[in-house]
A protein has these predicted regions:
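A solvent-exposed interaction/effector surface
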Residues: 2-199
Length: 199
């Protein structure tokens, strides 16, 4: 009976996940504008910072755990806020697991994992080239506009500031006009200008 309850709970979860994925695909197809929503709390481990591969033994072991223990692991792009503040658009890559799945799949945090807290964010689907060769051909400012340009415009219009690292989750890959592309759900954590000034 207990096993049956577990299976029912998991099937219910899968149903909700599929429903969420379908909504994301519909948004990607329509390229619906950005919207405000709290991001999902997740734990990630990076394998690349800018052009530098991160290869510490403990980090590689944790990446292996993420990839092989969680069927719901997500490939992410991360843009650190501190890099943006220095005028750089540095893209980091990693693997992420939703907070709720860490215990479910007996996974642990360590010095190589980072907790990405739930907070108010501006979200939107963006399309970028799927190959590193093509991505590396873009100027930083062009890439910034491609990935978060609509987010920044919305923030400007609504008097908001960036309030943390920006995260993008790959939601789908496709070939369009003979070229591989990726659709990412980009989340930019925000705070109002007024709140920022108080802090």
């Amino acid at each position: 009976m207990q096993q049956m309850d577990k299976e029912i709970a998991y099937m219910t979860y899968v149903r909700h996940r599929i429903k969420d994925d379908v909504l994301l695909m519909q948004k990607a197809a329509q390229m619906i504008d950005v919207y405000e929503k709290d991001c999902v709390e997740q734990i990630y481990v990076l394998y690349k910072e800018g052009g530098k591969l991160l290869q510490e033994a403990g980090r590689l072991k944790k990446i292996e755990e993420f990839l092989y223990q969680s069927p719901e692991v997500q490939h992410i792009y991360l843009i650190p806020q501190k890099e943006l503040e220095q005028g750089r658009f540095t893209i980091c890559n990693g693997w992420s697991v939703k907070d709720m799945h860490m215990e479910k799949y007996s996974m642990t945090e360590n010095e190589y994992t980072v907790r990405y807290r739930q907070k108010p964010s501006i979200m939107g689907i963006v399309k970028i080239p799927a190959t590193l060769e093509e991505l590396s051909g873009y100027e930083e400012e062009t890439l910034k506009q491609l990935m978060i340009g609509r987010h920044l415009q919305y923030m400007k219009e609504h008097h908001m500031c960036i309030n943390g690292d920006i995260i993008g989750v790959i939601v789908s890959k496709a070939v369009e006009n003979g070229k591989p592309v990726m659709y990412l759900l980009m989340s930019v954590p925000i705070v109002s200008d007024v709140e920022q000034n108080i802090v």
